[in-house]
Amino acid sequence: MNGSPYSSSSWVKSSLSTNSLGSLSNSYAAGSAGGSGNRSTVRGDSNKDQKLLGYLQKQSKSQLPNSNVKIFKKKWFWFESDSGTLFYSATSTGALSTPLTPSSLSENIKSIKITSQTTIEQSISFRLELIIKDKVPNDEFTVLNWVNTLNQWKKLNCNLDFTNDTTTTTNNSNNSNSNNNNKQYNSIENPDYLGKFGEVEGLLNAMSVSTSLNTMKTVKPLINKIQNDSEQLKLVLSQVEQQIEFLKSCQLELISHLSNDNNNNNNNNNNNNNILQILQQQQPISSKRTVSNDNLVGSNNSNNQLSLSIGLPINLNTSNTTTTTITNNTIEGENDDDEEEDEINQTSDIFSLLPTHLTLYVFSYLEPKELLILAQVSSQWQKLAGDNLLWVRFVTHFITPASIFDKSHNWKSVYLANTVTSLGYCSNYYYLKNQQKGGICTNKEKYMNRAISMYGVTPLTSLSSSKEGWLYKRGDDLLRIWKKRYFVLRDSSLFYFKHQNDNFPCGVILLNHGTKLKRASASTRKNCFKILQSKNSTITMVHKKRMPYYLSTDKEDDCNDWMILLNSIIKSNTQHQNNYGVITISGTSNNNNNNVYINNNNNNNNNNNNNNNNNNNNNNNNGSQSYNLPPLLSKSPSFSNALTSSTGISGGGGGSTKSRKSHKKSFSSGGGGSGGNNNFEQMQQQIQSVHLTPIYPMFGVALSKILENQSLITTQTHLKIPFILYICLNYIISKGIKEEGIFRVSGSLREVQELQEHFEQGREIDLDQHDIHAICGLVKTFFRKLPHTLVAADLDEYSTSVQLAASQTEDEKIQEFKFIFESISENSFHIFELLLYCLRLIVRNESFNKMTIENLLIVIMPTLKCSPVLITNGIKYYDEIFIKK
């Protein structure tokens, strides 16, 4: 340390520890306790030459990040009794026998001054630790006095320095300081500044802050002078009222402008001038916010943005399209395009002059229709309304949904009618789907059909792809270079494009009945599989040897998803048949034992109905509890009929066992005395009169595609949710509600994959022969592989905001959650209706299954891909949300 030992920074707190200091520190501790003959202990006047010295552990100011652990550093300490100062340095230079002074050390020396304000005490938590600290103020008044005085001094000096740099007037050097200060204060012009200092200004001029600080005199607190509640609140209130009046006047101006334009175009300019004169008289804002006549007259020109904002109230309830456009073809005297754009921008920027929080606050109390008008006119709200999250942005500033200001929920209907919705969650989606069914085909589909026509394959029947994504394809040339291509799977054809938006495909891979799919070796490339085609690569029976297609993905899960989907397409592909499906044969012989059938006919299957009734009676006798279905699904056929009337999936097992036995006997008996040719002819007749059950992929496909394929099956047309969910969830409701660890215990992966293949291939399934946990795993797998979420992102975020809204009552929150569920797509609504009903029954039986609502959320939320707030409140308020009174 250079200079005086007191030049170090003042100590607030210094902690010294004698722990693990060796013999010297131990003797120091003993000497301080009253031991005799120790050189580090001062005893009376006779030992003035002796000093306290030794190594101590000093607490460092630095600490480990995110930790409260104390860090101690070893320092050499000695005490000078003459000056009352405790010195310390890094080392003692090895001289322990002679007393050390600050001048005898070459290292930096720091000091601790012992004064009357210093407190020295033993640590309470650790006995081998002493604490030296200065006296700190023990009252809040002193702290506020210092804080307020210093802040005000800083603010005034900063303002004075700024005005000295920017002022253009020159003052005489002989003027007094008071005149200079007055000129500087008068040069500040800020119309939005909340009042001038008044008494505070004079008080600070008369007071010498530097003198007060040097003499350490107590300064009277200025908090009462600065924050005068009554005067400041009146000033703020007057400014807010002025802004509200100005906004209302601008709004009335725009509405009257439209009405005058529609009624009488000739008198339009006169009306605007009258309104402008009224506004200029009532406008309480400075000249920076005034609006000129040219700007308002220029707004008469046709502009999509302005006309849309003004025309929203007219077409508010009658518009079914996504956006509304109004064009004014009768406006005369149009100006140039450049002038028009400038004038419109200046008019819309009027609202952007307000602070963001004040704009939001004022707009929140407007009517729904007026809110949308100002949302289009204001440049601030254009940013918020552009991403379809207008009501969610309310929550960011208010912690309360905007719809709470509108008890009649008109604001929500206005929002849904005029917002730009995403594909899959709007009413226009079904309109587009109906148009596609009517035969509207884009250029991309035409080129795809043209690409596969050279192979002799029938054109594409669907306009939507089963799966799309980027894959790496190995080239067919000699170098075998891997190239990234965009693959599109349509029906049984796999197209690949160079770019995602290209219309012309680079090639096509046909997935016919002779195609094989295998996993490539790890030495080729990671996450790689190959597609092998037979020699008969075309239907024209032209023999052509084809090299395998090698495809690769970035992730292992994507590779497995592609392979599972392609395998299902290959197995279900029947290009040589008229329809997709599995052949089901119903015998025509009089002998019932020789029937061969996987029957889908509901009229000629009396034995199966009797067996199912017996199975239901047996299940009830075994003590299994039955539950009523939700109101919507209870209108559908019963659970047992749905199991037997669909693709042969049975909940019991009695009737299905007999059918399998008769199926085996029919092929082993040889026809019961009839000739082989007669049996062959009989089989041909049965095949010709076969009833086909369509097969389609159910996993990794959009809900709309699944339900579209499901509508082709007569026994499943009444279902409003995917068939696999209807069967599995109803089976869980009837058999697995009280199963311990339901949805938590993992089922066999092989059994889950087997169930998946059976459902997609339309095989006969006896759910009683499978583990209930495997069925739950199948349900979770279905939700996990959905390519989209069940709830839109804005609605999902809005549900969290409703949950956090502290100003809403419970009934208001229920209405908000009901609105959220009603705003999602119809398919997702029905899925949630059955799923939440099942989860509610599980929670009610938590004493048996040990599954509380917290445990359910842990295992089910990663698969549903939505906010847990929706699931929790959907279970809690199920009757109020889904049951219509």
UniProtKB/Swiss-Prot annotation:
The record marks R744 as: Arginine finger. Signal peptide: none annotated. It comes from the Eukaryota. InterPro entries: F-box-like_dom_sf, F-box_dom, PH-like_dom_sf, PH_domain, Rho-GAP, Rho_GTPase_activation_prot, RhoGAP_dom. Residues 348-394 form the F-box domain. It holds the Pfam family F-box-like. Rho GTPase-activating protein involved in the signal transduction pathway. This is Rho GTPase-activating protein gacFF. The gene is gacFF.
